[in-house]
Design a protein with these regions (language model features):
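Zinc-dependent deaminase
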Residues: 1-15, 87-145
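Short helix-loop-beta connector
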Residues: 65-69
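Short beta-strand scaffold segments in enzyme catalytic cores
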Residues: 23-31
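A short helix-loop-beta-strand connector motif used in the catalytic cores of GNAT acetyltransferases and
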Residues: 17-20
Length: 145
């Protein structure tokens, strides 16, 4: 398993251990993590801090050129909100742990020229499946249902 994806998975586990939704993400620039985060909606009472949004936030302000040369790793297929941020900042590549439990806006990313790689990671699939079964109300809230 790729070291960067491992860190994203570690962030997802951290969120779960905090009572949150197990989704993690890292933003990588020039082979270094510049931002890492996890879904903090439950922990912080936030309406927007999905894993990808938290990783972007924790990367702090960057010049546009940094985003245009970065890769974002996420344990779950990006929702429309996170997809919008990826497109807004021109991030050219997204590595997705799994899209079995939730298919985000991958088609839109591809349509806009973003390279999307799906790992079909069994650990991520099982972790999300278990979470959705155990806390369907939190999951539905997270995806706007």
């Amino acid at each position: 398993m790729d070291e960067f994806y491992k860190e994203a998975l570690g962030q997802a586990k951290k969120s779960l251990s905090e009572g949150g939704i197990p989704i993690g993400s890292v933003l990588v620039y020039q082979n270094k993590i510049i931002g890492k985060g996890h879904n903090r909606r439950v922990q912080d009472g936030s309406v927007i801090l999905h894993g990808e949004m938290d990783a972007l936030e924790r990367a702090n302000r960057q010049p546009a050129s940094v985003y245009k040369e970065s890769i974002i790793y996420t344990t779950l297929s990006p929702c429309p909100m996170c997809t919008g941020a990826i497109l807004l900042y021109g991030i050219p590549k997204v590595v997705v742990g799994e899209n079995t439990n939730f298919m985000g806006a991958e088609d839109l990313l591809r349509e806009k020229g973003v390279e999307v790689t799906v790992l079909h990671d069994p650990e991520s699939i099982q972790m999300m499946k278990d979470f959705i079964q155990e806390k369907p109300e939190l999951w539905n809230e997270d995806i706007g249902e």
